[in-house]
């Protein structure tokens, strides 16, 4: 993670900042107001558009901690990409396409004291196609805690096997819909810190490119409805799916 001093240095890079409209969902529970800070960079090495969520709640300390965590990760991607772009350009006598590095985000849930936000990274460094990765942050905005999937479930519960079975069932359905999906997915089990986001009454489990399927399959997502897991959720997290 970057220190405050490092972060201040990072922002000395020339860029243009725009303010986009605030994304806000009305609800009776605590919500976050979310603004967007946009960094653009276009030179002989790189084309880059970086959209950073700026999260605002009444508790300024919690807001700062959340923003530091997310912003530092995004800025590391941006700075690393600029270095890679220069190396990429210098290594080739002729560059057909510029290096591309973009970041955007989707707010998946902003209600019931939970903010679930998906940061979408994209990088192109030549070749047949670019590479993209999604990083979800699931935050209890009452206390600023970043939730991992195991945080949601009662200790000792068999949440992994329940989710694994549901994913296998969904893969079987994909194969029934299209025989070409047979043999595409090589799924064994979710991980201890499995990637996921929260949306409506669902936990959406997802996998990186190549994790369980080839590039052409994209980022596989599997929707786990609360009805499948309600009996093993911790009491304090049952309310987020109401």
Task: Mark where each language-model region is.
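Compositionally biased intrinsically disordered regions enriched in Thr/Gly
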Residues: 1-242
């Amino acid at each position: 993670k970057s220190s405050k001093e490092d972060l201040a240095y990072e922002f000395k890079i020339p860029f243009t900042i725009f303010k986009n409209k605030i994304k806000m969902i009305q609800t009776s529970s605590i919500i976050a107001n979310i603004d967007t800070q946009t960094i653009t960079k276009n030179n002989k090495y790189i084309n880059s558009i970086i959209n950073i969520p700026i999260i605002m709640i009444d508790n300024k300390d919690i807001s700062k901690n959340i923003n530091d965590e997310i912003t530092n990760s995004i800025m590391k991607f941006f700075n690393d990409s600029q270095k890679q772009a220069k190396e990429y350009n210098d290594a080739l006598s002729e560059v057909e396409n510029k290096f591309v590095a973009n970041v955007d985000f989707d707010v998946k849930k902003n209600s019931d004291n939970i903010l679930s936000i998906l940061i979408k990274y994209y990088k192109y460094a030549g070749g047949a196609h670019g590479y993209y990765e999604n990083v979800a942050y699931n935050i209890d905005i009452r206390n600023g805690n970043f939730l991992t999937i195991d945080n949601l479930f009662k200790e000792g519960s068999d949440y992994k096997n329940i989710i694994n079975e549901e994913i296998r069932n969904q893969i079987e359905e994909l194969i029934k819909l299209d025989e070409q999906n047979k043999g595409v997915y090589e799924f064994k089990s979710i991980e201890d810190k499995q990637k996921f986001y929260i949306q409506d009454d669902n936990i959406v489990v997802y996998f990186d490119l190549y994790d369980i399927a080839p590039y052409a399959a994209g980022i596989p997502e599997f929707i786990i409805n609360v009805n499948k897991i309600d009996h093993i959720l911790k009491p304090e997290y049952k309310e987020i799916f109401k």
